[in-house]
Swiss-Prot record:
It catalyses: a plastoquinone + NADH + (n+1) H(+)(in) = a plastoquinol + NAD(+) + n H(+)(out); a plastoquinone + NADPH + (n+1) H(+)(in) = a plastoquinol + NADP(+) + n H(+)(out). GO terms for molecular function: 4 iron, 4 sulfur cluster binding; iron ion binding; NADH dehydrogenase (ubiquinone) activity; quinone binding. Transmembrane segments: none annotated. [4Fe-4S] cluster 2 binds at residues 74, 104, 107, 110. Disulfide bonds: none annotated. PROSITE patterns: 4FE4S_FER_1 (PS00198), 4FE4S_FER_2 (PS51379). PANTHER family: NAD(P)H-QUINONE OXIDOREDUCTASE SUBUNIT I, CHLOROPLASTIC. It is found in: Plastid, Chloroplast thylakoid membrane. Binds 2 [4Fe-4S] clusters per subunit. The gene is ndhI. The lineage of its organism: Eukaryota, Viridiplantae, Streptophyta, Embryophyta, Tracheophyta. Its cofactor is [4Fe-4S] cluster. The keyword Iron applies. This is NAD(P)H-quinone oxidoreductase subunit I, chloroplastic. Residues 55-84, 95-124 form the 4Fe-4S ferredoxin-type domain.
Length: 166
């Protein structure tokens, strides 16, 4: 055949192929139109975190036996445990316990391996401050229970996000 005719046929095939690709992309865009939005208006709406969410660590001073298992299993040796050996009863007495959340990677190893369950993960994730030294929590700050977002009337909580079907 003539070269001009074959070029015209190739041009027609390429045009049809391009139109098909544009149509496929448009169909994907239309399939997302009936889904609910994934984003939330953060300060005014908050998601209720799952049970397994790893937020700020809660510490119960009375349960701790100063065994330092949390320090040994921490990948960055983060918890600082100060204790004193009581010679009359031959047991350790905990003096101070602190965690710096500016360095913590929230892996949860300390909570998982604690033999007395004095450590637990809370759902509190708002730990931002203007000074990084304020993120060093001692046993008093670690012992405070987190404020539940369910009890705050100014915040609308979003319970269940629908599953995205693909």
């Amino acid at each position: 055949m003539f070269p001009m005719v074959t070029e015209f046929m190739n041009y027609g095939q390429q045009t049809i192929r391009a139109a098909r690709y544009i149509g496929q992309g448009f169909m994907i865009t239309l399939s997302h139109a009936n889904r609910l939005p994934v984003t939330i208006q953060y300060p005014y709406e908050k998601l209720i975190t799952s049970e397994r969410f790893r937020g700020r660590i809660h510490f119960e001073f009375d349960k701790c036996i100063a065994c330092e298992v949390c320090v040994r299993v921490c990948p960055i040796d983060l918890p600082v445990v100060d204790w004193k050996l009581e010679t009359d009863i031959r047991k350790k007495r905990l003096l101070n316990y602190s965690i710096d959340f500016g360095i913590c990677i929230f892996c949860g190893n300390c909570v998982e391996y604690c033999p007395t369950n004095c450590l637990s993960m809370t759902e509190e994730y708002e730990l931002s401050t203007y000074d990084r030294h304020e993120l060093n929590y001692n046993q008093i700050a670690l012992g405070r229970l987190p404020m539940s977002i369910i009890d705050d009337y100014t915040i609308r909580t979003i319970l269940n996000l629908p599953e995205i079907k693909t």
